[in-house]
Amino acid sequence: MDEEIDAWISQLQSAHSEDARADAAEELGEFGGAPALAALIEALSDPSGTVRVSAALALGELRAASASSALQGFLTNPQPNLRGAAAVALGQIGGPNMSSVLLPLENDPSAAVRGAAAWALGTLADPSAYDALTRLQSDPDLDVADAAQEALVRLRKSLR
């Protein structure tokens, strides 16, 4: 298994194709372990936005708390796909005060980011997200409104 992880790390770090690097990030998110985690955190600086998105999502899958601060930096990135991936990953990672980090995304100009934020807030089981999720139920984008509705259902269940 170590050889396979090493091969994916090598591909992530040196493949010329951004798709190959992104695939490697996704695979490393399945394996975990310290070497994979270190490579994924490093990949957050890849020149390709596609690779950075894949690395962020993989770190979320791994619940990599050590990546929280780097992922939080993506929440203000000009690229909506990076903001959304960071929101999803941070929702999976959780932690103290994570809702307060994600709540400003309620007003993001990108519907995809607002939807990702709604999903993430629904995973955190934090009552402080209730008002924002209630407002997002009225979002003009139906996907965002649906994500907020589903998040509220999860939040209510977690608080019982």
Regions found by a protein language model. Name each.
Residues 56, 61-88:
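Helix-adjacent hinge/juxtasegments
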Residues 128, 134, 143-150:
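Solenoidal tandem-repeat scaffolds enriched in leucines and small polar residues
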Residues 7-31:
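Alpha-helical segment of the N-proximal tetratricopeptide repeat
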Residues 1-12, 33-45, 64-76, 95-107, ...:
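Amphipathic alpha-helical scaffolding segments comprising HEAT/armadillo-like alpha-solenoid repeats
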Residues 16-17, 47-48, 78-79, 109-110, ...:
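Short inter-helical turns and helix N-cap capping residues of alpha-solenoid HEAT/ARM repeat scaffolds
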Residues 27, 58, 89-92, 96, ...:
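Core register positions within helices of long alpha-helical scaffolds
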